[in-house]
């Protein structure tokens, strides 16, 4: 899995590519934690190129959201494909996170 990071309008945009599972979740967690500890508190996670997410990947998102809640931050998600979108629907994550169809839509009004 690869994660690219860019900043758009003071929002850290993380684009995930590949699979977010048991093997790759620790790296994703470390990257998010490092950014949060550096003072970042607004994140957009773009899953356009994410092929698969496991329960370990979902836990990474929950942990980051919990950290951000304590510092008045926010984590938004965009560009879910059909497979990842189904996991979000079944797990109820679409009610936990703000999910947007595109990156530009998610950044609007952040």
Regions found by a protein language model. Name each.
Residues 98-102:
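Short acidic-hydrophobic, aromatic-tinged amphipathic segments that line or gate anion-handling sites
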Residues 1-15:
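Short beta-strand/loop segment at the start of cytosolic alpha/beta domains
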Residues 25, 103-104:
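Residues at or immediately preceding the N-termini of alpha-helices
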Residues 82, 104-105:
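Acidic phosphotransfer microenvironment of two-component signaling modules
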Residues 22-96:
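Amphipathic alpha-helical interaction surfaces in cytosolic regulatory modules
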């Amino acid at each position: 899995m690869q994660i690219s990071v860019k900043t758009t309008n003071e929002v850290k945009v993380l684009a995930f590519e590949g699979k977010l599972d048991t093997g790759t979740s620790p790296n994703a967690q470390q990257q998010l934690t490092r950014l949060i500890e550096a003072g970042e508190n607004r994140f957009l996670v773009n899953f356009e190129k994410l092929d698969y997410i496991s329960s370990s990947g979902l836990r990474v998102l929950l942990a980051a959201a919990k950290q951000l809640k304590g510092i008045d931050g926010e984590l938004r998600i965009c560009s879910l494909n059909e497979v990842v979108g189904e996991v979000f629907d079944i797990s109820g994550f679409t009610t936990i996170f703000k999910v947007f169809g595109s990156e530009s839509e998610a950044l609007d009004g952040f």
